[in-house]
């Protein structure tokens, strides 16, 4: 799939994924998300998912995630700019207005957008604002289709996995009501625990007090963060990497819906990824069904060396 820059906005270019001479697929449902979902390029292309990139600034330079670099390239930029905290910008209501027109013009009849945690970005609210005004401002599109917006309630594979499943459903010919019912049910039930190996970025972003980060690094203390119900909190603290992985596996296995699929999120460390996957497999009796390598949204606040488990919670958890 070739990336085509379709429009130029005030401060940056917004790429829209199109194919030259694109032929509309059998499904007229368009599944859209943003780059904080950390969906792999392979799944993006296989299931016809449209992923909107976030603009990112490091120092005095601006980039577009997934366009100017992949995840490894972003980690390298972080290493090259150790004193700069990457900053992400929102996707604007104007951009969503243009996006909706493009999708309807392409022949799609139902647009489903799943956004990054709405407490972490104004992107969700901008998508809703554009939707609420769209058919009034563009009456020529009235009756052409529907637009539905979902809060991803988290980051990375926490909503990236449900987006992939929704795209699979669309490819299988499921009706839009079935897909939206699935998303409405699953998104609030997704939880993630992830361990942070270096506290510098968490301190810079304000997730952890600077003094606590200095002491924690000196003592080898590794925090386990929980993302749940739009909130990010420090859930546990462990001393040493082995205890960190064991604790995450214990807690995740205890809280997840028995027999349900789970995923591993990770950054630059494949060894820790594989060790955590092995511990989870031992705990629950089956392997993770997907892996999500974190991009700018999580790495900017936690650093590139993180690893975690994302799962669907059981009712009482």
Language model regions located:
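Mixed-charge interfacial surface used for oligomerization/domain docking
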Residues: 23-30, 36-44, 49-50, 55, ...
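Short N-terminal leader segment in a subset of presequences, especially plant chloroplast
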Residues: 8-12, 34-37
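Glycine-rich phosphate- or other oxyanion-binding loops that anchor nucleotides, phosphorylated ligands
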Residues: 82-84, 90-132, 176, 180, ...
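N-terminal glycine-rich anion-binding loop in soluble enzyme alpha/beta folds
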Residues: 30-95
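Hydrophobic residues in alpha-helical segments
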Residues: 78-79, 104, 170, 203
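Short, Lys/Arg-enriched N-terminal segments with co-localized hydrophobic residues
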Residues: 9-25
């Amino acid at each position: 799939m070739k990336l085509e820059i379709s429009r130029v906005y005030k401060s940056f270019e917004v790429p829209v994924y199109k194919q030259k001479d694109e032929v509309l697929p059998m499904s007229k449902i368009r599944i859209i998300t943003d780059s904080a979902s950390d969906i792999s390029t392979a799944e993006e292309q296989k299931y016809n998912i449209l992923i909107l990139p976030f603009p990112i600034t490091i120092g005095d330079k601006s980039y577009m995630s997934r366009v100017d670099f992949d995840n490894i390239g972003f980690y390298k930029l972080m290493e090259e700019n150790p004193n700069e905290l990457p900053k992400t910008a929102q996707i604007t209501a104007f951009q969503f207005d243009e996006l909706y027109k493009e999708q309807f013009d392409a022949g799609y009849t139902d647009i489903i957008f799943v956004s990054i945690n709405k407490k972490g970005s104004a992107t969700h609210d901008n998508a809703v604002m554009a939707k609420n005004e769209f058919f009034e401002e563009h009456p020529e599109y009235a009756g052409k289709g529907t637009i539905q917006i979902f809060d991803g309630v988290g980051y990375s594979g926490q909503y990236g996995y449900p987006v992939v499943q929704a795209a699979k459903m669309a490819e299988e010919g499921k009706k839009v009501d079935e897909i939206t019912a699935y998303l409405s049910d699953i998104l609030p039930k997704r939880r993630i625990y992830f361990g942070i190996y270096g506290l510098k970025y968490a301190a810079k972003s304000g997730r952890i007090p600077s003094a606590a980060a200095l002491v924690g690094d000196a003592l080898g203390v590794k925090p386990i963060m929980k993302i749940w119900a739009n909130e990010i909190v420090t859930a546990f603290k462990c001393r040493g990497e082995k205890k960190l992985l064991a604790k995450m596996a214990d807690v995740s296995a205890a809280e997840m819906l028995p027999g349900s699929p789970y995923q591993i999120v990770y950054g630059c460390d494949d060894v820790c990824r594989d060790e955590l996957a092995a511990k989870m497999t031992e705990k629950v009796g089956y392997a993770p069904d997907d892996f999500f390598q974190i991009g700018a949204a999580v790495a900017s606040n936690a650093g590139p060396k993180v690893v975690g488990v994302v799962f669907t919670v059981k009712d009482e958890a």
